[in-house]
Protein backbone atom coordinates (compact mmCIF):
# COMPACT_ATOMS: atom_id res chain seq x y z
CA UNK A 1 0.00 0.00 0.00
CA UNK A 2 1.52 3.31 -1.04
CA UNK A 3 1.95 6.09 1.53
CA UNK A 4 -0.27 8.45 -0.49
CA UNK A 5 -3.01 5.83 -0.82
CA UNK A 6 -2.94 5.08 2.89
CA UNK A 7 -3.23 8.72 3.87
CA UNK A 8 -5.52 9.96 1.11
CA UNK A 9 -8.86 8.69 2.37
CA UNK A 10 -8.48 10.12 5.82
CA UNK A 11 -6.51 13.31 6.05
CA UNK A 12 -8.24 16.69 6.03
CA UNK A 13 -5.67 19.17 7.29
CA UNK A 14 -2.15 17.72 7.31
CA UNK A 15 1.45 18.68 7.55
CA UNK A 16 3.78 16.42 5.55
CA UNK A 17 7.54 16.53 5.99
CA UNK A 18 10.50 14.44 4.95
CA UNK A 19 12.96 14.26 7.86
CA UNK A 20 15.30 15.50 9.19
CA UNK A 21 14.02 19.05 8.65
CA UNK A 22 10.63 19.90 10.16
CA UNK A 23 8.62 23.09 9.60
CA UNK A 24 7.14 25.18 12.38
CA UNK A 25 3.64 23.72 12.36
CA UNK A 26 2.33 26.09 15.03
CA UNK A 27 3.00 29.67 15.90
CA UNK A 28 5.42 30.13 18.77
CA UNK A 29 2.62 31.28 21.04
CA UNK A 30 0.65 28.09 20.50
CA UNK A 31 3.77 25.94 20.87
CA UNK A 32 4.75 27.45 24.19
CA UNK A 33 1.23 27.33 25.62
CA UNK A 34 0.67 23.71 24.67
CA UNK A 35 4.12 22.76 25.95
CA UNK A 36 3.38 24.45 29.28
CA UNK A 37 0.10 22.53 29.57
CA UNK A 38 1.75 19.23 28.63
CA UNK A 39 4.57 19.69 31.14
CA UNK A 40 2.02 20.45 33.86
CA UNK A 41 0.18 17.22 33.04
CA UNK A 42 3.41 15.22 33.17
CA UNK A 43 4.34 16.76 36.53
CA UNK A 44 1.07 15.50 38.02
CA UNK A 45 2.03 11.93 37.07
CA UNK A 46 5.63 12.12 38.33
CA UNK A 47 6.91 9.11 40.29
CA UNK A 48 9.82 9.49 42.72
CA UNK A 49 12.68 7.49 41.24
CA UNK A 50 16.19 6.66 42.49
CA UNK A 51 19.31 6.32 40.37
CA UNK A 52 20.26 2.80 39.30
CA UNK A 53 23.70 1.76 38.13
CA UNK A 54 24.56 -0.77 35.44
CA UNK A 55 27.42 -3.25 35.54
CA UNK A 56 29.18 -2.41 32.29
CA UNK A 57 30.78 -5.14 30.19
CA UNK A 58 33.27 -4.97 27.34
CA UNK A 59 31.53 -4.97 23.97
CA UNK A 60 32.89 -6.00 20.58
CA UNK A 61 30.60 -4.10 18.21
CA UNK A 62 27.68 -1.69 17.99
CA UNK A 63 25.11 -4.49 18.23
CA UNK A 64 26.51 -5.67 21.57
CA UNK A 65 26.46 -2.07 22.79
CA UNK A 66 22.67 -2.32 22.70
CA UNK A 67 22.24 -5.43 24.83
CA UNK A 68 21.24 -5.76 28.49
CA UNK A 69 20.80 -8.66 30.87
CA UNK A 70 18.55 -8.39 33.93
CA UNK A 71 18.95 -10.82 36.83
CA UNK A 72 15.53 -11.99 37.98
CA UNK A 73 14.59 -11.40 41.64
CA UNK A 74 14.32 -14.49 43.82
CA UNK A 75 11.00 -16.24 43.24
CA UNK A 76 10.16 -14.19 40.13
CA UNK A 77 9.82 -15.79 36.69
CA UNK A 78 10.36 -14.08 33.37
CA UNK A 79 6.64 -14.46 32.65
CA UNK A 80 5.84 -12.44 35.80
CA UNK A 81 7.53 -9.30 34.46
CA UNK A 82 5.62 -6.58 32.61
CA UNK A 83 7.51 -4.49 30.05
CA UNK A 84 6.35 -1.41 28.14
CA UNK A 85 8.14 0.76 25.59
CA UNK A 86 7.06 4.41 25.40
CA UNK A 87 8.33 5.57 22.02
CA UNK A 88 7.34 9.21 22.61
CA UNK A 89 9.63 9.58 25.64
CA UNK A 90 12.03 6.79 24.60
CA UNK A 91 11.43 5.16 27.99
CA UNK A 92 11.35 1.42 28.70
CA UNK A 93 9.49 0.47 31.89
CA UNK A 94 10.15 -2.89 33.57
CA UNK A 95 7.70 -3.84 36.34
CA UNK A 96 8.80 -6.58 38.75
CA UNK A 97 6.61 -8.16 41.45
CA UNK A 98 7.92 -9.14 44.92
CA UNK A 99 10.97 -6.89 44.73
CA UNK A 100 12.80 -5.26 47.65
CA UNK A 101 15.17 -2.28 47.61
CA UNK A 102 18.12 -4.61 48.29
CA UNK A 103 17.60 -6.20 44.87
CA UNK A 104 18.42 -2.93 43.13
CA UNK A 105 21.47 -2.34 45.33
CA UNK A 106 23.18 -5.47 43.93
CA UNK A 107 23.53 -4.30 40.31
CA UNK A 108 20.88 -6.52 38.69
CA UNK A 109 21.57 -5.06 35.21
CA UNK A 110 24.60 -6.07 33.17
CA UNK A 111 25.60 -4.86 29.71
CA UNK A 112 26.49 -1.63 27.96
CA UNK A 113 25.11 1.77 28.95
CA UNK A 114 26.30 3.54 25.79
CA UNK A 115 22.74 3.82 24.46
CA UNK A 116 21.16 4.84 27.78
CA UNK A 117 20.53 8.44 28.86
CA UNK A 118 19.08 7.70 32.29
CA UNK A 119 18.47 4.67 34.51
CA UNK A 120 16.36 4.70 37.68
CA UNK A 121 14.18 2.52 39.91
CA UNK A 122 11.37 2.72 42.45
CA UNK A 123 9.81 0.29 44.94
CA UNK A 124 6.18 0.60 46.00
CA UNK A 125 4.81 -0.11 49.47
CA UNK A 126 3.52 -3.42 48.16
CA UNK A 127 7.06 -4.50 47.20
CA UNK A 128 6.50 -4.03 43.49
CA UNK A 129 9.60 -2.80 41.69
CA UNK A 130 9.89 -0.52 38.67
CA UNK A 131 12.92 0.10 36.46
CA UNK A 132 12.84 3.00 34.01
CA UNK A 133 15.40 3.12 31.20
CA UNK A 134 15.52 6.30 29.12
CA UNK A 135 17.18 5.56 25.79
CA UNK A 136 19.18 7.90 23.54
CA UNK A 137 16.77 7.27 20.64
CA UNK A 138 13.76 5.16 19.67
CA UNK A 139 14.38 1.41 19.85
CA UNK A 140 12.35 -1.74 19.29
CA UNK A 141 12.83 -4.47 21.89
CA UNK A 142 13.83 -8.05 21.14
CA UNK A 143 13.41 -9.94 24.43
CA UNK A 144 13.90 -13.42 25.84
CA UNK A 145 14.36 -15.00 29.28
CA UNK A 146 15.45 -18.16 31.06
CA UNK A 147 15.26 -19.30 34.68
CA UNK A 148 17.73 -16.69 35.92
CA UNK A 149 17.84 -13.77 33.52
CA UNK A 150 15.82 -11.53 31.21
CA UNK A 151 17.62 -10.50 28.01
CA UNK A 152 17.08 -7.30 26.01
CA UNK A 153 18.31 -6.42 22.54
CA UNK A 154 17.61 -2.84 21.42
CA UNK A 155 17.07 -2.53 17.66
CA UNK A 156 16.76 0.71 15.70
CA UNK A 157 13.51 1.10 13.73
CA UNK A 158 15.36 0.82 10.42
CA UNK A 159 16.84 -2.50 11.54
CA UNK A 160 13.27 -3.80 11.82
CA UNK A 161 11.29 -1.93 9.14
CA UNK A 162 11.80 -0.95 5.51
CA UNK A 163 10.33 2.51 6.07
CA UNK A 164 9.56 4.53 9.21
CA UNK A 165 6.66 6.99 9.55
CA UNK A 166 5.65 9.24 12.45
CA UNK A 167 2.00 10.35 12.65
CA UNK A 168 1.04 13.24 14.92
CA UNK A 169 -2.51 13.94 16.11
CA UNK A 170 -2.51 17.66 16.89
CA UNK A 171 -3.19 19.11 20.34
CA UNK A 172 -4.69 16.84 23.06
CA UNK A 173 -5.21 16.83 26.81
CA UNK A 174 -5.94 20.33 28.09
CA UNK A 175 -5.05 21.83 24.71
CA UNK A 176 -8.26 21.46 22.65
CA UNK A 177 -7.05 23.28 19.54
CA UNK A 178 -9.77 24.97 17.50
CA UNK A 179 -13.23 24.74 19.09
CA UNK A 180 -16.72 25.35 17.72
CA UNK A 181 -20.19 24.39 18.94
CA UNK A 182 -18.76 22.14 21.65
CA UNK A 183 -16.50 20.26 19.25
CA UNK A 184 -12.76 20.23 19.94
CA UNK A 185 -10.21 19.95 17.17
CA UNK A 186 -8.12 17.55 19.27
CA UNK A 187 -10.90 14.92 19.08
CA UNK A 188 -11.23 15.20 15.30
CA UNK A 189 -7.45 15.01 14.88
CA UNK A 190 -7.30 11.89 17.03
CA UNK A 191 -10.24 10.26 15.26
CA UNK A 192 -8.50 10.65 11.90
CA UNK A 193 -5.24 9.26 13.28
CA UNK A 194 -6.97 6.21 14.79
CA UNK A 195 -8.60 5.48 11.43
CA UNK A 196 -5.19 5.77 9.79
CA UNK A 197 -3.71 3.48 12.44
CA UNK A 198 -6.33 0.82 11.67
CA UNK A 199 -5.22 0.86 8.02
CA UNK A 200 -1.53 0.63 8.88
CA UNK A 201 -2.17 -2.15 11.42
CA UNK A 202 -3.78 -4.26 8.69
CA UNK A 203 -1.19 -3.49 6.01
CA UNK A 204 1.15 -6.19 4.70
CA UNK A 205 3.87 -3.61 4.07
CA UNK A 206 6.89 -3.63 6.39
CA UNK A 207 6.33 -0.04 7.56
CA UNK A 208 7.07 1.01 11.14
CA UNK A 209 4.54 3.63 12.24
CA UNK A 210 4.94 5.60 15.46
CA UNK A 211 2.23 7.84 16.90
CA UNK A 212 2.74 10.90 19.09
CA UNK A 213 -0.55 10.06 20.77
CA UNK A 214 -3.37 7.51 20.46
CA UNK A 215 -5.42 8.89 23.35
CA UNK A 216 -6.36 12.23 24.89
CA UNK A 217 -2.81 13.04 26.00
CA UNK A 218 -0.76 16.08 25.05
CA UNK A 219 2.93 15.39 24.35
CA UNK A 220 5.08 18.50 24.35
CA UNK A 221 5.99 20.07 21.03
CA UNK A 222 9.59 18.93 21.54
CA UNK A 223 8.50 15.34 22.22
CA UNK A 224 6.53 15.27 18.98
CA UNK A 225 9.51 16.52 16.98
CA UNK A 226 12.01 14.28 18.78
CA UNK A 227 9.91 11.17 18.12
CA UNK A 228 10.48 11.82 14.42
CA UNK A 229 14.14 12.71 14.81
CA UNK A 230 15.01 9.90 17.23
CA UNK A 231 13.26 7.26 15.13
CA UNK A 232 15.05 8.59 12.02
CA UNK A 233 11.65 8.75 10.34
CA UNK A 234 11.32 8.88 6.57
CA UNK A 235 8.00 10.74 6.83
CA UNK A 236 6.36 12.98 9.42
CA UNK A 237 2.62 13.60 9.08
CA UNK A 238 0.77 15.95 11.43
CA UNK A 239 -3.04 16.05 11.44
CA UNK A 240 -4.88 19.31 12.14
CA UNK A 241 -8.33 20.79 11.54
CA UNK A 242 -8.17 24.56 11.45
CA UNK A 243 -10.73 27.30 12.00
CA UNK A 244 -10.90 31.00 11.26
CA UNK A 245 -8.94 33.28 13.57
CA UNK A 246 -12.15 34.76 14.99
CA UNK A 247 -13.72 31.35 15.55
CA UNK A 248 -16.89 32.48 13.82
CA UNK A 249 -18.76 30.47 11.23
CA UNK A 250 -17.23 30.97 7.79
CA UNK A 251 -17.72 29.85 4.21
CA UNK A 252 -13.97 29.17 4.03
CA UNK A 253 -13.31 25.44 3.87
CA UNK A 254 -11.11 22.92 2.12
CA UNK A 255 -7.89 20.93 2.44
CA UNK A 256 -4.44 22.41 2.93
CA UNK A 257 -1.02 20.77 3.16
CA UNK A 258 2.02 22.49 4.66
CA UNK A 259 5.58 21.40 3.93
CA UNK A 260 9.19 22.40 4.54
CA UNK A 261 10.31 24.94 1.93
CA UNK A 262 13.94 24.21 2.78
CA UNK A 263 13.56 20.61 1.57
CA UNK A 264 14.21 21.10 -2.15
CA UNK A 265 14.88 17.49 -3.17
CA UNK A 266 12.96 16.25 -6.21
CA UNK A 267 11.14 13.68 -4.08
CA UNK A 268 11.11 15.80 -0.94
CA UNK A 269 8.48 17.37 1.27
CA UNK A 270 6.86 19.46 -1.45
CA UNK A 271 6.39 16.47 -3.75
CA UNK A 272 4.87 14.37 -0.98
CA UNK A 273 2.65 17.25 0.12
CA UNK A 274 1.31 17.60 -3.43
CA UNK A 275 0.54 13.87 -3.59
CA UNK A 276 -1.38 14.11 -0.31
CA UNK A 277 -3.26 17.21 -1.42
CA UNK A 278 -4.27 15.72 -4.76
CA UNK A 279 -5.55 12.47 -3.28
CA UNK A 280 -7.30 13.99 -0.25
CA UNK A 281 -9.16 16.66 -2.20
CA UNK A 282 -10.28 14.04 -4.69
CA UNK A 283 -11.40 11.55 -2.04
CA UNK A 284 -13.22 14.14 0.07
CA UNK A 285 -14.35 16.34 -2.81
CA UNK A 286 -12.94 19.23 -0.82
CA UNK A 287 -11.63 22.57 -2.02
CA UNK A 288 -7.90 22.78 -2.80
CA UNK A 289 -6.48 25.43 -0.44
CA UNK A 290 -2.86 24.84 -1.46
Predicted feature locations:
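Short linear recognition/processing motifs and adjacent strand/loop elements at protein termini
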Residues: 1-166, 173-174, 192, 198, ...
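Glycine-rich N-terminal loop/short-helix segment of MobA-like nucleotidyltransferase
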Residues: 171-181
Amino acid sequence: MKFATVTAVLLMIIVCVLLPKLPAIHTWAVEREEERIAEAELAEQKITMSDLTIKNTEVADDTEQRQLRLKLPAGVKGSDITISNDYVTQTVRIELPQTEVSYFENDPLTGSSNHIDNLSYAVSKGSSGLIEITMDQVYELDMDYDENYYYFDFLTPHEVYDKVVVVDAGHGGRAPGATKQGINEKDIDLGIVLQLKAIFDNSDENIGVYYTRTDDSNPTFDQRVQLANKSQADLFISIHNNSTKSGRMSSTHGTQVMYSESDTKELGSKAFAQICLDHVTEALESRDKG
